[in-house]
Amino acid sequence: IVAFCLLALAGCAPQNAATQGGSSSGAYAVVTDDRGTVVTLPEKPQRVVVLSTSLLNFAAAVDGDLAGRSAVKAEDASLPAKYQAVPDVGPVYNVSLEKVLACQPDLVIASADHHAKLAAQLEESHIPVLVLKTKTYDDVKRNLDIIGKVYGKEDAAKAKEAELDQAVQAIADAVPAQGKRVAIIHATPSSVSVELPSSIAGDMAQRLHLQNIAGGASTDGQTTRIPYSMESLVQADPDVIFLTSMGSSDKIEKRIQEDIKGNPAWASLSAVKAGRVYVLPEKYFLLNPGLDYPKAVAYMAHLVYPESVHE
């Protein structure tokens, strides 16, 4: 059925469908996505489908219309009112190809973390796809730029960026330039790791001048986490420990108990003794907060410096 839909859609695709890396002469817009793919849009898209929650908010920021959207499943995540009646194509982790095709999109905006295979399937049928990553604050601003360009609302995107910059900078200015030493531990039911400055929470910590104990790790530039070691944690002895997680809360608690709290060395850590171990909410620190970036930065800053920053 899927193959038939793809062939049918390819057969009736308009002649001016966007091409990847084709001629940009007279094009409405030419955009390079986070794969390095050059996407040429001959005309302004009229039926845009967005496949992740954070990217939905970027579209809403420039008042962009949608023909389809991802389902909002994450705890406490909110769907912009503008998109309540827009057909959903499934959750970000399990988007339905059939539902995307049913929206008859002339542009799909997808997540680099989840939609590589789906993007390839859509592109085989000459449906243009922008694949974007959203990890750091710089990603947030770049995505705003791109989506503003898609909708022809570059000025609105720039205005929103300026608003975000001002809010984030105000928080950073309110905390010490030489920040406390922190560890950001990520737990899933199967493993425990330590987050790098390239992760969502790590990027925020860096903007708050916090010293990430994993900041000196050598990586390929794309890695956001490295293996956890209690020995390394004890040696670094951070002032504050943040916990992020993904998966069933019962299974995660079991993993944390087995790999972290069950180790006698855990109790010797300065952060543990001082009661400075904090669980970070999924809506801000597992998923990129997007336009709520200032709220997320303020949340972290308040945990570390409650006397200086209020949520």
Predicted region positions:
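Proline-aspartate-enriched helix->loop->beta-strand connector
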Residues: 96-110, 127, 229-243
